[in-house]
Swiss-Prot record:
Cooperates with DnaJ, GrpE and ClpB to reactivate heat-inactivated proteins. Induction: By stress conditions e.g. heat shock. In the resting state, the DnaK-DnaJ-DafA complex cannot bind substrate. As the substrate becomes sufficiently high, DafA is displaced and an active DnaK-substrate-DnaJ complex is formed. Forms a heterononamer with DnaJ and DafA in the resting state. Three copies of each protein are present in the complex. This is Chaperone protein DnaK. CDD domains: ASKHA_NBD_HSP70_DnaK-like. PROSITE patterns: HSP70_1, HSP70_2, HSP70_3. SUPFAM superfamilies: Actin-like ATPase domain, Heat shock protein 70kD (HSP70), peptide-binding domain. NCBIfam families: PRK00290.1, PRK05183.1, prok_dnaK. It comes from Thermus thermophilus (strain ATCC 27634 / DSM 579 / HB8). Belongs to the heat shock protein 70 family. The keyword Hydrolase does not apply. The gene is dnaK.
Length: 615
């Protein structure tokens, strides 16, 4: 039986979960993250979703769509305030609804939401090794009928059969109370990125009965971000006379910095917001920089109006349920914004008890939705996995080449590690692109996922040692880790889609690889020649920095380095690349000899260029 999933389609982040052995399990996306940013970007004819979309937002503010949940199921006239806050264009649709305009093309909020759902489902399908077509999707308890229908339509656009739309606090209570014995009265305090819900339930003997619910669909963590944005913009305008909110790129930078500051102030008492080159002075045309300290006390002052708005729904829910705070057994915190200390203090003051932190506020809603999906689907069966890997597995390396770590038909379980390094000086992060297939070039193979290893100490190119390990366990689940040896910093991704291709598709890929063998060999050879020249250039630059040679030899070496750069950028033909590499290595050798003669010392630097003449 195919699996049904539970999806928390959030304002700022989304999560997908499935029931495994009767327990809800959150599924990581292709980037190895359990939480996927609810962000869609349109760039150069390509659509990005999630972390990749969020990462490029500053450079593409008008083409990066976030917080779309605030617009779904709403009329344009209802969203004037929200529309002013975002850098992208929000325009009225022909039906009076909301549209997002990107480069002349109009998108409905349902379409954008469907792209997020599709990303979640496709990544989850790969992890599970089977196509997902059914889902339970959660919405804020305070969503109206139009918003609920629009959310269900987004699911259908994404190719899903939406089994049920359920309320987020109810889903959270399901996850919390699944294994509980006895009766409890629970208040779920759900403050997400864009919405606020309070729901009171009685839980007992597997029955989850909602007694009352209240909320505010215009209140969430992003409102706290915007409070910081407004403060920063006002302070900057006072000092420099420049309105940062009028510049879409500057506004996007402010939004990202504000979110980061809010998160930091949950664990520290003070943070510094630093945004260099945020604007130009109108008179002198010189760059202006923003640097501002923000204390937790000041942050709490800025969000005080928002904190006051939390009280009404709690009091209303208690009143509707006919309960006093003393009759509430547990208060469950849900949503990332509940990590803000001032929010937790409001809960203590209103309910007179310490909130229960036994659930993960980011994941519990999706887990509850997965439980509901499991109930609706009946018994969930185990996933059947093959005992060999049907196609080669590897990573993309410099020049767009696929480097194979585990060849096809390797018996599992198995583990294979390789050492890689950086391509540029002072590179502090690498992106690991995991691939499956038989073609030499990465672009011709199936992409299984990407993840980043960050925090690499700045070092010359070729010095860091990054150990990438592929580990396929007995269940056929692929785990990929990347570790920088000097710091021990590590990143990982788990991919369960290594066997999702049909036998016909596997055979087609193998046959295609044979047909393209000669073309692929030439392309790979070309990539290797470019890599060899670029590696020689990087090492030659290091020699210039570290050794003092004769002026004439230095000039020759600098000229050879310049030529190498030009040829690589121009994507020159193979003979030119090969000749330039030989010329550069010769210039390095002459420079080294001159430097050694001048110092009277023997050789202490060895140039190890990864160059191999073509056959």
């Amino acid at each position: 039986m195919a699996k049904a999933v539970g999806i928390d389609l959030g304002t700022t982040n989304s999560v997908i979960a499935v029931l495994e052995g009767g327990k809800p399990v959150v599924l990581e996306n292709a980037e190895g993250e359990r939480v996927t940013p609810s962000v869609v970007a349109f760039r150069d004819g390509e659509t990005l979703v999630g972390r990749m979309a969020k990462r490029q937002a500053v450079l593409n503010p008008e083409g990066t769509i976030f917080e779309i949940k605030r617009f779904i199921g709403r009329r344009f006239e209802e969203v004037q305030e929200e529309a002013k806050r975002v850098p992208y264009k929000v325009v009225p649709g022909p039906d009076g609804g909301v549209r997002v305009e990107v480069k002349g093309k109009l998108y409905t909020p349902e379409e954008i939401s469907a792209m997020i759902l599709r990303k979640l489902v496709e990544d989850a399908s790969k992890k599970l090794g089977e196509k997902i077509t059914k889902a339970v999707i959660t919405v804020p308890a305070y969503f109206n009928n139009a918003q609920r229908e629009a959310t269900a339509n987004a699911g259908r656009i994404a190719g899903l059969e939406v089994l049920r739309i359920i309320n987020e606090p109810t889903a959270a209570a399901l996850a919390y109370g699944l294994d509980k014995k006895g009766n409890e009265t629970v208040l779920v305090f759900d403050l997400g990125g864009g919405t606020f819900d309070v729901t009171i339930l009685e839980i007992g003997e597997g029955v989850f009965e909602v007694k009352a619910t209240s909320g505010d669909t215009h209140l969430g963590g992003s409102d706290m971000d915007h409070a910081i944005v407004n403060w920063l913009a006002e302070e900057f305008k006072k000092e420099h006379g420049v309105d940062l909110k009028a510049d879409r790129q500057a506004l996007q930078r402010l939004i990202e910095a504000a979110e980061k500051a809010k998160i930091e102030l949950s664990s520290t008492l003070e943070t510094t917001i630093s945004l260099p080159f945020i604007a130009l002075d109108p008179a002198s045309k010189t760059p202006l920089h923003l640097e501002k300290k923000l204390t937790r006390a000041k942050f709490e002052e800025l969000i005080q109006p928002l904190l006051k708005r939390l009280r009404g729904p709690v009091e209303q829910a208690l009143k509707d349920a006919g309960l006093t705070p003393a009759q509430i057994d547990e208060v469950i915190l849900v949503g990332g914004a509940t990590r803000v200390p001032a929010v937790q203090q409001v809960v203590r003051e209103l309910l007179g008890k310490e909130p229960n932190r036994s659930v993960n506020p980011d994941e519990v809603v999706a887990m509850g939705a997965a439980i509901q999906a499991g109930v609706l689907m009946g018994e969930v069966r185990d996933v059947v996995l093959l005992d060999v890997t049907p196609l080669s597995l590897g990573v993309e390396t410099k020049g767009g080449v696929m480097t194979v770590l585990i060849p096809r038909n390797t018996t599992i379980p198995t583990r294979k590690c390789e050492i890689f390094t950086t391509a540029e000086h002072n590179q502090t992060a690498v992106e690991i692109h995991v691939l499956q297939g038989e073609r030499p070039m990465a672009q011709d193979n199936k992409s299984l996922g990407r993840f980043r290893l960050e925090g690499i100490p700045p070092m010359p190119a070729g010095v860091p040692q990054i150990e990438v390990c592929f580990d396929i366990d007995a269940n056929g689940i692929l785990h990929v880790t990347a570790k920088e040896r000097s710091t021990g910093r590590e990143a990982s991704i788990t991919i369960q889609n290594t066997t999702t291709l049909s036998e016909e598709e596997i055979q087609r890929i193998i046959e295609e690889a044979k047909r393209h063998a000669e073309e692929d060999r030439r392309r790979r050879e070309h990539a290797e020649l470019k890599n060899a020249l670029d590696s020689a250039r990087v090492q030659a630059e290091r020699v210039l920095q570290e050794r003092q040679g004769a002026p004439e030899a230095r000039a020759r070496l600098e000229a050879a380095i310049g030529k190498a750069k030009e040829l690589v950028e121009r994507d020159a033909p193979d003979p030119e690349l090969k000749a330039a590499t030989e010329e550069l290595l010769k210039a390095v050798e002459e420079y080294e000899k001159g430097a050694q003669a001048a110092s009277g010392k023997g050789p202490d630097d060895v140039i190890d260029a990864d160059y191999k003449p073509a056959d």
